[in-house]
């Protein structure tokens, strides 16, 4: 038996990185999955790598309320309901930097996807979990919701702090209705998003590496293993958690040489 047998999950940002890994792992463990992404082609690539019949692709802009509502409705219509929300979609553009340099337009764009997107997925997804008598919501925050950085991405960091706070509030609100809400807080992960940021600036990557106790980036599957636990019934009493999967980054003061 799989750890997610008979569960239905909606995964945003499923076209690559942690979202794709989650779709692959969740379907391997028996779940039915809506693999949603802004780019339909990459979502379809994810579905093609999943067991046949276990997933379908959906094109969605998570900042668009009508599209998010349609995604939830399509998933419930196809698979009979929804049990798990893995709200993973997020952006970190180059023009999100210091508070002194970041434009209002850049700030708003990040907030629309990273904060409003999670809000909309919860707003339109949780009613389906209530219909099932409960379920699990996994909101992807970040270690930057816990730690500050001199190498600022001001809107991204603020958005992840908002996701963390939102997750706590929802966890308390819906606890007695069988819904668990947790904030998955990854450390730096080897994803296209991060590699794109540092691809042309290895010195910037090295500046950060000295703060990682493990000395390396996390692999997407290592983060998604945490999401699998939170999605499964094994975590039935885990609610409102700041679920850090960061290789000890937030525990560190001086790292090994």
Place the predicted regions along the sequence by residue:
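Short C-terminal tail/terminal secondary-structure segment
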Residues: 96, 228, 239-257
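Residue(s) in the substrate-gating loop at a strand-loop-helix junction
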Residues: 142
């Amino acid at each position: 038996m799989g750890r997610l047998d008979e569960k239905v999950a909606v995964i945003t940002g499923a076209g690559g990185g942690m979202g794709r890994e989650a779709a692959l792992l969740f379907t391997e463990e028996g779940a039915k999955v809506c693999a949603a992404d802004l780019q339909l082609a990459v979502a379809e690539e994810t579905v093609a790598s999943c067991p046949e019949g276990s997933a379908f692709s959906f094109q969605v802009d998570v900042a668009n309320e009508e599209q998010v509502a349609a995604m939830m409705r399509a998933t419930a219509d196809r698979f009979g309901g929804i049990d798990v929300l893995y709200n993973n979609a997020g952006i970190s553009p180059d023009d999100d930097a210091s508070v002194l340099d970041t434009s209002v337009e850049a700030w708003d764009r990040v907030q629309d996807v990273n904060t409003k997107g999670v809000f909309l997925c919860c707003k339109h997804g949780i009613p389906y979990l209530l219909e099932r008598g409960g379920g699990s919501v996994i909101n992807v925050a970040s270690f930057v919701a816990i730690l500050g950085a001199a190498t600022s991405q001001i809107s991204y960091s603020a958005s992840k702090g908002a996701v963390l706070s939102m997750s706590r509030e929802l966890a308390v609100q819906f606890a007695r209705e069988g819904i668990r809400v947790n904030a998955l807080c990854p450390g730096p992960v080897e994803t296209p998003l991060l590699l794109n940021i540092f691809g042309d600036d290895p010195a910037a990557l090295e500046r950060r590496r000295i703060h990682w106790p493990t000395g390396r980036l996390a692999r997407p599957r290592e983060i998604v293993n945490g999401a699998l636990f939170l999605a499964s019934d094994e975590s039935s009493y885990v609610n409102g958690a700041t679920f850090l999967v960061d290789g000890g980054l937030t525990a560190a003061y001086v790292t090994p040489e």
